[in-house]
């Protein structure tokens, strides 16, 4: 969501994103400008990461420790612990390919950039979707729901999202859920500062007459 801050009657409210995922991506962004995110704002890893609520007042607590998450899965569905570990190994591999080899190295001018030796080896993951992959591994509906929801942050449905995007599950369970100590607006202020250092000028509450590309 859009990171905003609302102040009223002496109170300050953090508005927008619920949590801070993929801290390595933020770190890389600031490093591009010779900055360290840790020098600009402080983040704290949440433990537990979050709790998922279901009907009938049932809930599942998601720990910040992947080993504990595996135990939680195993307690809910026998045999699911080992399946989750293998699933996350694949998700981590996909994450490193998507972020390190694709996001940072490809200019994004053509879809043909996505075709290389590594992506060809994962071609089968583009032929099925998150929904089918998760349902094929896990029987319990709660576990299925937990594993399917991260792709919603991509603005997509599990049934329409290629299984390659299970790297979002690694972002969730592997990298964990974080929160900026003073709210997300600290991240916004840091980005504004960098933009201004690069010569960007911000015109607020102004009409847009033209978009130059």
What name fits each language-model region?
Residues 15, 145-147, 204:
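General beta-strand structural signal in soluble alpha/beta enzymes
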Residues 125-126, 135, 166-212:
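Helical element adjacent to the flavin cofactor pocket in flavoenzyme catalytic cores
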Residues 17, 159, 178-182:
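Alpha-helix capping and helix-loop boundary segments enriched in small/acidic/polar residues
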């Amino acid at each position: 969501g859009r990171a905003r801050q609302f102040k009223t009657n002496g109170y300050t409210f953090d508005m927008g994103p619920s949590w801070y995922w993929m801290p390595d991506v933020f770190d890389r962004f600031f490093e591009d400008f010779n900055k360290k995110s840790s020098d600009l704002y402080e983040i704290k890893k949440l433990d537990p990461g979050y709790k998922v609520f279901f009907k009938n007042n049932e809930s599942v607590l998601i720990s910040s420790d992947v080993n504990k998450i595996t135990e939680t899965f195993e307690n809910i569905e026998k045999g699911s612990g080992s399946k989750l570990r293998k699933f996350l190994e694949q998700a981590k591999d996909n994450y490193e390919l998507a972020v390190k080899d694709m996001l940072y190295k490809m200019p994004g001018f053509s879809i043909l950039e996505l075709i290389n030796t590594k992506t060809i080896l994962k071609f089968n993951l583009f032929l099925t979707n998150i929904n089918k992959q998760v349902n094929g591994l896990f029987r319990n509906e709660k576990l299925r729901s937990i594993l399917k929801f991260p792709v919603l942050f991509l603005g997509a449905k599990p049934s329409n999202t290629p299984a390659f995007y299970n790297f979002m599950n690694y972002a969730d369970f592997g990298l964990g859920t974080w929160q900026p100590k003073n709210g997300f607006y600290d991240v916004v202020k840091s980005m504004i500062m960098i933009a201004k250092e690069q010569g960007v000028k911000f015109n607020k509450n102004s009409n847009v007459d033209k978009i130059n590309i």
